[in-house]
Amino acid sequence: MHIQVVTFKLDGIDDAAYQLHAEQNAPVFAAMPGLRAKIWLANRQAGTYGGIYTWDDAAAMRAYQSGKIFQGLQANPHMIDVTVRDFPVLAGPTKVTRGGY
């Protein structure tokens, strides 16, 4: 399992417009190969949004990163200061805490 954390700020759109965008695009992520789950994030006070992605493995994450959807996120003028971090999962303790294994 592999975790990816993506954050960004909104520019030129408000929270309601982003929420509509997220709801319209959620089915696209639900059908994405290798994606176990995406948790959508919104810290409205800080103006920071993003997602936590749980991937089957690093290869599935890399396929997403080289694809059209991720490239569109990075090119979207309404999503600025994009940060992307990824982490391999420690399987042993994650199993103990019911982390999806």
Named regions from a protein language model:
Residues 1-49, 56-66, 77-101:
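Short S/T/G/P-rich N-terminal loop/turn motif that feeds into the first structured element of a domain
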Residues 71-76:
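A common structural junction motif
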